[in-house]
Amino acid sequence: MARHRNVRGYNYDEDFEDDDLYGQSVEDDYCISPSTAAQFIYSRRDKPSVEPVEEYDYEDLKESSNSVSNHQLSGFDQARLYSCLDHMREVLGDAVPDEILIEAVLKNKFDVQKALSGVLEQDRVQSLKDKNEATVSTGKIAKGKPVDSQTSRSESEIVPKVAKMTVSGKKQTMGFEVPGVSSEENGHSFHTPQKGPPIEDAIASSDVLETASKSANPPHTIQASEEQSSTPAPVKKSGKLRQQIDVKAELEKRQGGKQLLNLVVIGHVDAGKSTLMGHMLYLLGNINKRTMHKYEQESKKAGKASFAYAWVLDETGEERERGVTMDVGMTKFETTTKVITLMDAPGHKDFIPNMITGAAQADVAVLVVDASRGEFEAGFETGGQTREHGLLVRSLGVTQLAVAVNKMDQVNWQQERFQEITGKLGHFLKQAGFKESDVGFIPTSGLSGENLITRSQSSELTKWYKGLCLLEQIDSFKPPQRSIDKPFRLCVSDVFKDQGSGFCITGKIEAGYIQTGDRLLAMPPNETCTVKGITLHDEPVDWAAAGDHVSLTLVGMDIIKINVGCIFCGPKVPIKACTRFRARILIFNIEIPITKGFPVLLHYQTVSEPAVIKRLISVLNKSTGEVTKKKPKFLTKGQNALVELQTQRPIALELYKDFKELGRFMLRYGGSTIAAGVVTEIKE
């Protein structure tokens, strides 16, 4: 208990003899110099005064968010409005309130360029009024008393105004306005004051300078700021400027007068497609000798010496190891009058979907057949890919064909063998829909390079063949009419992440044209983005047109939302996305009749989508298109019918009558092509 007594009897007053001053680091009793205290001691009494933090005003934010809701708009119109606002914000920044921008967009019916012009015109009028008032007040001060040399420096001296010069009738912004040179604004003359002399002297000297400049350079005149503001500074390319570009003239200028042609090489597996085109590229100089020597050495080590030229187009290790093309290889070469985009399609039956992707992007085709005994028959008879490839390219819109009868050196350039092959193939191609005048037959040898870029000098061939070589036949193809004037359409064939911001897509522009800075809409994801860059044949360009195979760098969209098969279009004229549509189809050779509920694989451009035939509407006459039978129970080979299809996921389609390139598709079942069709009606 002794400890408790000690605690109870403790005198606490001894601990509180002095008051503690918490506002100081040490007590005043300690001796310390003022300099040391100022250096090491902190005093709250000397704390600097801090202004109260200004609270953020959220009223303006609420007003801007509610400004759109005040206007009763549909969901689609709201999306268009937000898109227009984003575009205008990129040009104007935050200088103009949202309400003014919204009113301008609605007043001009969602036309961004007209709305921008209206807002800029309104700002110009207001700024001119302010300048006029400032001019009048400055004139009054000048008449009253001379301006002191120290106070006469106006804002126009500190921040020089840009003066617009007219050179030979063209408006160009050239330099800054020199102090002392007058510029007329809205009928009032404003003179920048100078140091030293009064304003009257400055006016006199400026008049002398102005007359001297006019006499020395008559075509060069300083325009009023009204002309400058009537054509606002192009912060971003406007749609009006883009529409003024003559795309056809620019296209010819870019290609040096040569026309663009997309060529696909098709044929049965092991017919020699890659070797034929690889050797042609080497002879044209597209592949240097050092690279070709490297391919020859590597192919010899792999035990595939005859595949050296094929390795020019078969770039992946798996393709070189197996000796089979698996994906579409793409490259470029030039002829006398054409710029050719070459697509080497796979010939193996397992890779028909990839072949359809390449053929859907082609304008013309080269069909390669093997002239060896037994090989041509194997590829041409049932189960071979020669027939199927010929039907596919014709169904996908290819009307011009060059048939390269390859490996003729293995049959000693026999004329009888060549005529036998051309007779069988010519009859089949005529049935498939090719005109005789649009089909050419050329005897070639891909390994030796005979009759590829120059006419053969071999006596065994020249004694009976006097026709064109393969390159001359390709050069004689007629390029199709490009849909440059139609709305922009691009089908995605590949998506990948590149260095830097955004991501890249590749594909062929089917219609219209595009420039950097354009906004695009992706369907069916229904997402918008901006074109940051355009690459054509591995070279950056500012624009591209229909027929070009391009790579676009996009920003403002997540890469996860874009898949192979998506179609990019302009936001003003979007493409429709649906799961149900009606189509007119032509049935090929099938063993099982097509009935209601028949499952198929739909191949459309770069899309491969499972589908079901929901309805058999009618059977049509092949020639006239008239209905011969309504609501048939089944369809057999050779019939032309109107059916309704339904896909599992939405796909972006166009009617065949509007866009022929985007209105064709193929139907496959069980590893073989059973029908080709065109879209006639799109259901919701």
From Swiss-Prot:
Region (G2): 323-327
Keyword field: Acetylation, Cytoplasm, Elongation factor, GTP-binding, Hydrolase, Nucleotide-binding, Phosphoprotein, Protein biosynthesis, Translation regulation
Pfam families associated with the record: GTP-eEF1A_C (PF22594), GTP_EFTU (PF00009), GTP_EFTU_D2 (PF03144), HBS1_N (PF08938)
Record bears the keyword Aminoacyl-tRNA synthetase: no
Location within or outside the cell: Cytoplasm
Enzyme class: hydrolase
Record-level GO cellular component terms: cytosol; cytosolic ribosome; Dom34-Hbs1 complex; extracellular exosome; membrane
Phosphoserine sites (modified residues): 49, 67, 117, 127, 152, 154
Catalysed reaction equations from the record: GTP + H2O = GDP + phosphate + H(+)
Annotated spans, G3: 344-347
Residue ranges, compositional bias (Polar residues): 212-232
Region (G5): 445-447
Domain (tr-type G) ranges: 258-482
One of the GO BP terms on file: translation
Tissue: Detected in heart, brain, placenta, liver, muscle, kidney and pancreas.
An annotated Gene Ontology molecular function: GTPase activity
PANTHER family named in the record: TRANSLATION FACTOR
Disease cited in the entry: Defects in HBS1L have been found in one patient with a developmental disorder characterized by growth restriction, facial dysmorphism and developmental delay. Additional pleiotropic features include sparse hair and eyebrows, deep-set eyes with blue sclerae, bifid uvula with a submucous cleft palate, velopharyngeal insufficiency, C2-C3 vertebral fusion, scoliosis, vesicoureteral reflux with a bladder diverticulum and significant hypotonia. Deficiency is caused by the complete absence of isoform 1 and isoform 3, while isoform 2 is relatively unaffected in this patient.
Function recorded in the entry: GTPase component of the Pelota-HBS1L complex, a complex that recognizes stalled ribosomes and triggers the No-Go Decay (NGD) pathway. The Pelota-HBS1L complex recognizes ribosomes stalled at the 3' end of an mRNA and engages stalled ribosomes by destabilizing mRNA in the mRNA channel. Following mRNA extraction from stalled ribosomes by the SKI complex, the Pelota-HBS1L complex promotes recruitment of ABCE1, which drives the disassembly of stalled ribosomes, followed by degradation of damaged mRNAs as part of the NGD pathway.
Subunit structure: Component of the Pelota-HBS1L complex, also named Dom34-Hbs1 complex, composed of PELO and HBS1L. Interacts with the SKI complex.
Annotated family: Belongs to the TRAFAC class translation factor GTPase superfamily. Classic translation factor GTPase family.
Name of this chain's protein: HBS1-like protein
Organism: Homo sapiens
Name of the gene: HBS1L
